[in-house]
Design a protein with these regions (language model features):
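Bacterial N-terminal signal peptides
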Residues: 7-19
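N-terminal soluble domains immediately following signal/targeting peptides that reside
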Residues: 22-140
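Positively charged n-region of N-terminal signal peptides that target proteins for export
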Residues: 1-5
Length: 140
């Protein structure tokens, strides 16, 4: 009888724990990235991370940012830099030193309580940064 109770308790515990884990696994980060020129080929970036479902700020994560040019894969890429937490929860700051102007795909890697990767493609010009324009699609 004791063995049956133990099995029932373990089964109930698993039933309660598994949904919580699956909910945590579904949490995704949303990233708003704003960059501005800070010098020749250097850009100061502010990243605001939120939970994509609840819109709550994601504080306490380790954020690293890498970049590469989608038009020239593996030719131009930037070693990832660690972002520093900003003044408000969920806000992070980093300086990117790029190799040239143009479209860069930023890879935002989150570690800690939430592990995720967010990709954002931006156009870095000498005087401003804006969302990259999408290449025209061709139908054949």
């Amino acid at each position: 009888m004791t063995r049956v109770r133990l099995i029932c308790v373990l089964a109930a515990t698993c039933a309660v724990c598994l949904p919580a884990e699956s909910v945590l696994a579904q949490v995704r980060a949303k990233a708003d990235v704003m960059c501005r020129p800070a010098g020749t080929l250097q850009y100061d970036c502010t990243i605001v991370l939120t939970n994509s479902r609840t819109k709550e700020p994601l504080a306490g994560v380790t954020l690293t940012i890498g970049a590469d040019m989608p038009s020239m894969p593996m030719m131009h890429n930037v070693r990832p830099v660690k972002a520093e937490p900003g003044e408000t929860p969920g806000t992070y700051r980093a300086r990117l030193a790029l190799e040239m102007h143009g479209d860069w795909a930023l890879q935002l890697n989150l570690a800690g309580p939430l592990r995720d990767r967010v990709l954002r493609t931006l156009r870095f010009d000498p005087d401003r940064v804006m969302p990259a324009t999408k290449a025209p699609s061709h139908k054949h």
